[in-house]
Design a protein with these regions (language model features):
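Low-complexity, acidic/polar, glycine-enriched regions of mature
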Residues: 18-198
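Bacterial Sec-dependent N-terminal signal peptides
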Residues: 1-25
Length: 198
């Protein structure tokens, strides 16, 4: 009887040990279908555009997002709200040392660290991540709508950052005086949509 009891206990422990082991699937982000749109603002006007994802992986454990990382091709940053001539002029400025200095820092890196449930719906999550721009890393926190079916996923988020934390101070009223209507707000907004390759 004692032997049977011990055998049963061992069997139960074995089942639980297997059940508790994480099973991480590294799911590839579709660079063709995923998008990042940016919005930058001055006192009197906004500008918007896009920047491309170079590559990315999201980590899924039994249908839950648990981590991930994707790189952003800063050399692809482009403006979309003006004429071609004006767009190219602003693109060149965004790529130089005043802003993202893409020749020296061609990639930005986004690393997801922790994910926890948020209010706002069954698919709403609060995500804490590290964002590296121009070799400078700072944490960012935001709410994302995440949907996962097997190894298919979609994640949508609106992320706002203070650009000056990444040493992007050009035209900032926090560092320069008497800018008038040439002052550029410190906040940059990114609308991010990530989709899986599957």
């Amino acid at each position: 009887m004692k032997k049977i009891f011990l055998t049963t206990v061992l069997a139960i422990l074995t089942i639980f040990s297997f059940a508790s082991k994480p099973h991480i699937d590294n799911v590839v982000v579709s660079t063709e279908n995923s998008t990042i749109k940016w919005i930058g603002s001055k006192i009197s006007e906004n500008h918007e555009g896009t920047v491309n994802i170079k590559k990315g992986i999201l980590m899924i454990d039994h249908g839950k997002l648990v981590g991930g990382q994707f790189s952003i091709d800063m050399q692809s940053i482009s403006t979309t709200d003006m004429s071609d001539k004006l767009n190219k002029k602003l693109d060149g400025h965004l790529k130089n040392e005043d802003f993202f200095n893409v020749e020296e820092f061609p990639l930005a890196i986004f690393t997801i660290n922790t994910i926890q449930k948020a209010s706002g719906g069954v698919n709403s999550f609060e995500i804490l991540a590290d964002l590296t721009i121009k070799g400078i890393t700072h944490p960012v926190t935001f709410i994302s709508t995440v949907k996962i079916e097997g190894l298919n996923f979609s994640a949508i988020a609106k992320i706002k950052i203070d650009r000056t934390k990444w040493n992007i101070k050009y035209g900032s009223g926090s560092f320069f005086e008497n800018l008038g209507d040439k002052m550029i707000l410190d906040k940059i907004e990114f609308d991010v949509t990530l989709l899986s390759v599957n």
